[in-house]
């Protein structure tokens, strides 16, 4: 217990002792008390330590004031409680954020006063936002639960956080927990702040989703879409087909509301995007031929659809792929997505034809 542990001043006088319950027992000279609190007085000298990440750190103590260690109500403050807890658990290594560097100088003095060996310290870089400020809830998600609710997988989040300020020394970005544990070395941790990049985190999460067993992916996707009206009464086989197409492109289950165009009869168009896609006369002419020829197909597969698009492009002297983006906007309402031909096959001829016709019928000049 802490019964015999005492803190002494530079003259060797006891100013504070701790019993087994960590209750403060004030003893010693009144000069160490101010308004009922107890302060730790120390000799003004340089304090230094060899940090496992930042190297040797030192601080001249001529500007440091005596340290309050016990409040007026007798309860210990963070510094003395922290040091005594480390002593009780025989802590040899302390790894924490570098916002505690200033505290470490004070703790070293307390360890010395208590006659305890100084633990080895490793101060990790802080996670910062795009402005270089410490990341906080003002920047958005700040708690692990926030990321879980957004649909981030635990292993992906663990993977990403480990890579903040650290690297394995090779080009690997996706690693299992066991691989991370085996590869991790404090010596490879950078001392500079690490910026949280949500795009990188989402991309990494997408890699994990892409490798998830399909039956698990489908089950979680079904749970995620259940809140949307368009998901009600969906055929299971059709849903599985859509999920199989989109698994490799899904980064978060919270984004599955973007799957709606597969399940609704029509789509809502962003007029700005539609105008951009159909602004050229030759493109509109090509699209008119595409929709006519698609309607005549007896086999609506990727090869047949691709041939229709290619022929229309040649007829109106459009370069390779110039009709792909306009087609995507017309049939999905968006500008990005899974493979266009595979998407159209899943949607089926009726939906593709009706959506293209609807888009071409819009008077864009009036919009």
Label each region the model flagged:
Residues 1-123, 128-135, 143, 168:
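Active-site cores that bind ATP or allylic diphosphates and position pyrophosphate for catalysis
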Residues 2-15, 27-31, 226-240, 256-367:
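Basic, alpha-helical terminal appendages of large translation-related enzymes
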Residues 29-48, 87-96, 149-151, 155-156, ...:
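Short, charge-rich amphipathic segments
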Residues 95-96, 146, 297-298:
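A generic structural signal for short
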